[in-house]
Regions:
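Extreme N-terminal leader/targeting segments of oxidoreductases
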Residues: 1-24, 42, 461, 465
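Glycine-rich FAD pyrophosphate-binding loop
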Residues: 42-63
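Glycine-rich active-site loop/strand segments that organize a redox cofactor
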Residues: 69-108
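An anion/pyrophosphate-binding glycine-rich loop and adjacent beta-alpha core
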Residues: 269, 273, 282-381
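Glycine-rich loop(s) and the adjacent beta-strand/alpha-helix scaffold that form part
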Residues: 179, 223-293, 472, 478-481
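Conserved redox-cofactor binding core of oxidoreductases
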Residues: 107-225, 247-248, 393-412
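N-terminal Rossmann-like FAD-binding beta1-loop-alpha1 element of flavoenzymes
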Residues: 22-49
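A glycine-rich dinucleotide-binding beta-alpha-beta segment and adjacent secondary-structure elements
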Residues: 207, 215, 381-465
């Protein structure tokens, strides 16, 4: 529920007293906010972070912890993988569109190795080991994994596959509760605190404050139910996350997510976007959404995914986020996994970070014809799909969707189907249009003076597609830029 407090900007002339003051004021203490705070402090600014909850972390601390980095990071090299900024850009432009921001992606790829080194210098630990199994994330403390379908069709023909999912090393991870994202946030917050960054908690930002020239000079927030005014002598950085939990904004901009659970935190209510919009800020890719597919990849890769017509529609060995998008956007959220008994048992016994996503078969039969009938599919629909798949699988190929040969195996008997209809949830990727220096742009195309933003409240490197790690990667990368830019203001 969005607060009913007026969102129109306040005039500084109406502020009788500033309750807090700093050179740079950062709204949000997640990955974008902490990165902005560190760089602003290193640039000599006095920094104050306003956090809505009672502690740092945001969605980042609950995330699996993937940071999308490449171009030849020390971790990639240590694990035996070659990559270059150009190769990374080729993949990202193909996978993150349509309409991907080429200037941002070029900038991000060229700065990726330096960004990895920055994280390491801030104390973020990475183990020099690669996890090569299908999965949402490494189940152990391995530091590198494929996280965007780079090694699956069609991307493995477009760019040379290289794993770019960098995960902070952490013991005792619990997916969705305390993931690798915690070990990303903890050292960064400690770095910020050593630099003298201050934080005020239970601060719900309400609106921006501008002077008579239109420059952003502060924020009005609610702290413990009381309005407080916070002055920013140099600049304000917005870093409060997406609008995944604002039903009104979802209905207006990303209606494909209506009724789908938000894969975010409830504090992601879009307030920063609305605050900046009230100043005339431009938006980009507000319809863009990531969609998670809720079935363990170790099972999915060993069967075939079919839609409500019994037809395959996606290579099963690709990134689960891509499967989710293809299912929700193009198959009316209808999906079934057809798999034989031997393959199901093999997948169920495989090591995974998400054993709780191992769905049980709903239907089982001795023949595909019986299974098809039990599922209520038109006679011959599933049979023809399996027949074509098995014909080529006998030779270890998949000319239809190009699943890699290592996962291509004829479907035998007995055979079962998992009912995965509606097994998707998502979060928003669109937001404020920003420059590579994290300046928030007015609809006129000019930067709004004194206002910067980063993270999921902005439109970053993802314009439609997604790869795990682009949120934490983009948020930290452009969070740093926001802090530097804000600190430079007079």
């Amino acid at each position: 529920m969005v607060d009913a407090t007026p969102i129109r900007p306040r005039s500084a002339a109406t502020v009788t007293k500033w309750d807090y003051e700093a050179d740079v004021v950062v709204a949000g203490y997640g990955i974008a906010g902490v990165s902005a705070a560190i760089e602003a402090a290193r640039a000599g600014a006095d920094v104050l972070v306003l956090e809505r909850t009672s502690g740092w972390g945001g969605a980042a601390a609950l995330a699996g912890g993937f940071i999308y980095l490449g171009g030849g990071t020390p971790l990639q090299k240590a694990c035996g993988f070659d990559d270059s900024p150009e190769n990374m850009k080729t993949f990202m432009m193909a996978a993150l569109g349509p309409g991907a921001d080429e200037e941002k992606i070029t900038d991000y790829c060229e700065g990726s190795v330096a960004h990895y080194n920055w994280l390491v210098d801030c104390g973020v630990p990475f183990k020099e080991s690669f996890w090569g199994e299908p999965g949402w994330e490494p189940p152990f403390d391995d530091g590198l994994m494929y996280s965007g379908g780079e090694n699956a069709a069609p991307f493995n023909e477009i760019a040379t596959p290289a794993p770019r999912g960098h995960v902070p090393q952490m013991d005792g991870k619990r997916t969705g509760e305390k993931g690798g994202g915690y070990m990303l946030m903890k050292p960064l917050v400690e770095t910020a605190e050593k630099l003298g960054v201050r934080a005020e908690y239970d601060m719900r930002v309400q609106t921006l404050v501008t002077d008579d020239t239109g420059r952003v000079v502060g924020i009005v927030a609610k702290q413990y139910g009381k309005d407080v005014a916070v002055r920013a002598r140099r600049g304000v950085v917005l870093a409060t996350g997406s609008f995944a939990y604002n039903d009104k904004m979802i209905e207006a901009h990303a209606p494909r997510l209506i009724g789908r659970p938000g894969a975010a935190i409830e504090e992601h209510d879009g307030r920063s976007i609305l605050m900046a919009q009230a100043l005339g800020a431009d938006l980009a890719h507000m319809d863009a959404t990531e969609v998670a597919f809720l079935c363990d990849p170790q099972l999915v890769v060993r069967g075939i995914l079919v839609n409500g017509r019994g037809q395959r529609y996606v290579p099963e060995d690709t990134y689960s986020g891509r499967i989710g998008q293809m299912t929700l956007f193009h198959q009316d959220n209808q999906a079934f996994l057809v798999i034989d008994e031997a393959s199901y048992e093999e997948g169920a016994a495989a090591t995974t970070a998400t054993p709780f996503l191992r769905a049980q078969p709903k239907w089982a039969a001795e023949t595909v014809e019986e299974l098809e009938s039990d599922m209520g599919l038109p006679a011959g629909a599933l049979q023809s799909t399996v027949e074509v798949y098995n014909k080529h699988a006998a030779e270890g190929s998949d000319p239809l969707l190009h699943k890699k040969s290592e996962w291509v195996k004829p479907i035998g008997s007995p055979v079962a189907a998992l009912d995965l209809r509606g097994f998707t949830l998502g979060f928003t990727l669109g937001g404020l249009r920003t420059t590579v220096n994290s300046e928030v742009l007015h609809v006129s195309g000019e930067p709004i003076p004194g206002l910067f933003a980063a993270g999921r409240c902005t439109s970053g490197v993802c314009a439609g597609g997604y790869a795990s790690g682009t949120s934490l990667g983009d948020g930290s990368f452009y969070g740093r830029r926001a802090g530097i830019s804000a600190a430079k203001q007079n």
